[in-house]
């Protein structure tokens, strides 16, 4: 039997400029605006120029990606929690 070392996710050094957040949810009116509004609560420096919105191949889902300056783990967790609380978000990457 061989021992495998615990695999750890890469460490993020804060503040982390241009940190990508990708949100996938049901396509529908106002989804991208909702995502931007929630993220902007926690990252007021969100640059709308970095916003990328894509439809899924069948049009059922949308992905919304933005870049923020991540300040700490608590900020990222708060963004994740608020997005998931909407009931419209399936994944936050």
UniProtKB/Swiss-Prot annotation:
The protein here is known as UPF0250 protein PSPA7_1111
Recorded family membership: Belongs to the UPF0250 family.
Q: Which domain of life is it from?
A: Bacteria
- List the Pfam families hit by this protein, alphabetically: DUF493 (PF04359)
Q: Name one GO cellular component term.
A: cytosol
């Amino acid at each position: 039997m061989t021992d495998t070392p615990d695999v750890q996710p890469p460490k993020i050094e804060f503040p982390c400029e241009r940190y990508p957040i990708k949100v996938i949810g049901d396509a529908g009116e106002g989804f991208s605006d909702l995502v931007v509004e929630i993220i902007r609560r926690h990252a007021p420096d969100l640059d709308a120029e970095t916003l990328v919105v894509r439809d899924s191949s069948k049009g059922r889902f949308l992905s919304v990606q933005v870049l923020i300056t991540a300040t700490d783990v608590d900020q990222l967790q708060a963004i994740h929690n608020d997005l998931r609380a909407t009931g419209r978000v399936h994944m936050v990457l």
